[in-house]
Amino acid sequence: MSHHISGVTLHPEQYPTDRHYPFNLPVFRQTKQLRFEFPVTFFAGDNGSGKSTLLEAIALACEIHIWRKHEFGRYEVNPYEKQLFQHVSVEWINGRLPGSYFGSEIFHDFRRILDVWAASDPGQLKYFGGKSLMTQSHGQSMMAYFRACYSRRGIYFLDEPETALSPNSMLELMDIIQVNSEAGHAQFIIATHSPILLAFKGAGIYSFDQSPLRVIPYRETAPYKIYRRFLIDR
């Protein structure tokens, strides 16, 4: 198995503010470097801990396009919200590679855009199993996307892919990740709350529940502890 980026460096001395998110989070002020020693790395942490924010920042620093949802007017706008990537350096092993970013929040927009493309070029759907993603359930369309997208050499970012997936589908996603990472062409960095996905064998898990960030064993993750306690109490 191989991987394409060996680590990233954060530059807190360059941050434009220490009062606004995400630059006010201790994990981003106290963490200088993350090492990626395995083809699959997970970011685990509570809501608001910064895991999805860092995932997106690394993807942008890798020059990977991220689909953007249409944003309606907001009561309060944080001008620093999407700037973290400007202060992240990526350490490539053999030069920059392409990849993709999956976000559950923006996947619905992607499905609709794909349908627009398919109206003029139905062949677009062959890549995703030959059926419109809009005619399938959310979970089914996500699995069609996952089956199609990771066979090429690259680095792949997934933000909470467990959304809308059944336990069986999560196990299938783990199989997809395992096959493509073991083939040596794909590296995955995944933000998740799922104790099922976090159980992926041979992965590194960064915990965002303490600062600075550090790699922890699976059984020390909060999702594992919480689900285990819940099931024992039943």
Where are these regions (language model features)?
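N-terminal pre-Walker A segment at the start of P-loop NTPase domains
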Residues: 1-32, 37
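ABC ATPase nucleotide-binding domain signature region
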Residues: 40-42, 53-119
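The conserved Walker
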Residues: 46-47
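Conserved glycine(s) of the Walker
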Residues: 50
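Conserved D-loop beta-strand region of ABC ATPase nucleotide-binding domains
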Residues: 54, 159, 190-191
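Conserved P-loop NTPase mechanochemical-coupling segment
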Residues: 111-136
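C-terminal lobe/lid and adjacent interdomain/linker elements of RecA-like ASCE P-loop ATPase modules
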Residues: 168-189, 193-234
